[in-house]
Design a protein with these regions (language model features):
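Short, solvent-exposed micro-motifs at the edges of structured domains
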Residues: 1-144
Length: 144
């Protein structure tokens, strides 16, 4: 069983935007520049279409970095149950076989990924992906 609160994330400008005029729009993994936060991004009715209040963020004046802090928002939580059923049978004194049935995400709970956190993106504030659905695995293990 795994239970986790949501992962923190940072709102930034699209990686191609060099709003601070430093000559470095991105370091290869996201935006260097951040927007200005003008209000609370918290929503009482967050959904995959609008995880946070996108209107709480605006482009800063050209040549500035913006005032949004690092990891100021939290994504969806994560809950997962994995289960394995094993049955071992002795074939001889030196050999055994093990039948395995394994279930990952047993209850098939939808665990959402982080929302799009880049101001200027058409999907800003939306969650567009989720972690894998339930997977079942049947195996036979021979030990000698």
């Amino acid at each position: 069983v795994t239970l986790q609160s949501g992962r923190p994330f940072t709102v930034g400008l699209l990686p191609a935007i060099d709003n601070s005029n430093t000559g470095r729009a991105a370091l290869g993994f996201g935006s260097n520049d951040r927007p200005n936060q003008t209000g609370s991004p918290a929503l009482s009715d967050a959904s995959v279409e609008r995880w946070f209040d996108t209107e709480a963020f605006v482009f800063p004046a050209f040549g500035s970095f913006g005032n949004t802090g690092r990891n100021t928002l939290e994504g969806p939580g994560f809950a997962n149950v994995n289960l394995a059923l094993l049955k071992g049978v002795a074939l001889s004194d030196a050999a055994r076989v093990q039948l395995r049935l394994e279930a990952f995400n047993l209850f098939n709970r939808t665990n959402l990924d982080l929302p799009d956190a880049f101001l200027g993106s058409p999907t800003f504030g939306q969650i567009r992906s989720a972690r894998p659905a339930r997977r079942l695995q049947l195996g036979l293990k021979l030990m000698f």
